[in-house]
């Protein structure tokens, strides 16, 4: 996969939106575990008050954002880990967070990894999808996506009827402009989108 070109050369918000409907999976011992991306968020670097690199912050913890586009940036909060990918050229610390997937491959293993939690609870959030894939550490942080067991299949894209742009989730410490910036993208009506109310679920999960 030509991840370097995919994750550079255009606005990070556009890259983030283009990830919707792409297969995202983890290859574990020959087994494929994952599904279609249904929700993602863009973070726009040193001027984005919600970004880990805001103001030019650079540390061992967020170094992945500063690397070349297509580099994995895994960060942790408490016991949870989150999967991001650096966008833009090295030194321009922007990135996208994969927030949710609709599970397709390795469902039995996902159920085990999530302690039996099934249905939308399986992968309807960024920490949940990492748990479902069996990822518990930052071991693959800083690795090029192409050299890792994670795959985003750029040759396939499940078409969504509508992709919604909305404010990012949990951004309360930023100034209002950044807190309300429409940098979260999701498939309208897909039950695996984090926080999607049951009354808004579509029978076809929002796919064409």
Curated annotation (Swiss-Prot):
Q: Which GO terms describe its molecular function?
A: alkylbase DNA N-glycosylase activity; DNA binding
List this protein's GO terms for biological process: base-excision repair
Gene3D superfamilies per the UniProt record, alphabetical: Methylpurine-DNA glycosylase (MPG) (3.10.300.10)
Name this polypeptide is given: Putative 3-methyladenine DNA glycosylase
Keyword terms: DNA damage, DNA repair, Hydrolase
Q: Which family does it belong to?
A: Belongs to the DNA glycosylase MPG family.
Q: What is its EC number?
A: 3.2.2.-
The family database entries (InterPro entries) matched by this protein are listed as:
Formyl_transferase-like_C_sf, MPG, MPG_sf
Q: Where are the membrane-spanning stretches?
A: none
HAMAP family, per database record: 3MGH
